[in-house]
Amino acid sequence: LFPLMTVGGVDTHQRAEDSTKRVFILTRSFFAGQQRYGANTWSGDVASSWESLRNQVPLCLNHTLTGNPNVNTDIGGFFAGAYNRAWGDNSAVSNPQFRELYTRWMQFGLFNPMMRSHGTDVYRELYYYGQPGEPVYDALVGAVKMRYRLLPYIYSTAYNVSVGDGSFMRALFMDFKDDKNTWDNNRQFMFGPSLLVCPVVDPLFTEEKIVRTDETSGWNKVGNDAVGGWPAVDWTQDKTYDVYLPAGADWYDYWTNEKYTGGHSISAPAPISHSPLFVKAGSILPMGEDMQYSGEKPWELVTLNLYPGADAEFTLYEDEGDNYNYLDGKFTLIPMRWNDRRRELTIDAVKGAFDGMPAERTFRVTTPDGKSRDVKYTGKRVTVKM
């Protein structure tokens, strides 16, 4: 009960101090009911290891199953000293074992309700991990860029979490309860209504480092046997990873647009640049432009990625971004519907208004077969034939 009362006190008193900014609470303590304050719980100061990364997936899913949708982890793990050559020398930024772990954790964190890189012992800033054109650096930057591009999808999902009792990270059996193969799948999950996330939680390019804890020093990780230079790794190798595609839907590989039938496992491409990601057929996936921070650009160009194979619905939510005016009705909803038989997308009239909302915007409608159409939207209903 103490975490609930503490978080509630922070929320109440901070809003009393300044109601023009939304309260932001990050906590490792949790009690039932805490979701009413929008507090985000993280999994604690976990070790930087593949074992820890594997455990984060079911941990996050179990947390959301309690009714609290807001959960995240320290990307890369918190205690990473075992990857350094010597205590505090930060050499782990060049250690291929940590580089691979950090990259895959970043690709998992991309699909957490909060994406947050944090830890000790090793610098986490991306510029320590190479330069543009180098595989690890490009993979890390690519994950961050995709997070920002997904903001229209994530923010709209957050609206559904708030008013529709939804969740960001969904255990597969929540959406595919008739498929027994999803019941104990603790390595994959749905992120929002459309994205099947398949994080790579095993090393594919390096050997797994077993991280142990010295009982005499507690959190100080030991067991580093690195001497001399780090071994060379060819990050351009083709790798694959086993993925289960739930029955009851067809699936598109997000990266290749190849279509698969659900109900079986496949070996999906898993290069260092990205982890396997699939989109459910019958989805509308809105994405924004490249941005450096969430409010850098208004949503004047939104790409609507259509994935045919079934009818689809999506409601795009938007508001002023950082205040409580939405509680007074200052927000907009743009319902969208895809008719698969007619190959038509209907974008309904905008509902609501808020200060600074775009007077018009462009929806770039795309399909996996490469078709693309730009549609000027002024708030009135429009139908697009694809």
Description of each model-found segment:
Residues 279-381:
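Accessory, solvent-exposed terminal regions and/or long lumenal/extracellular loops of proteins
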Residues 236-238, 263, 377-386:
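Solvent-exposed, conformationally flexible loop/turn segments
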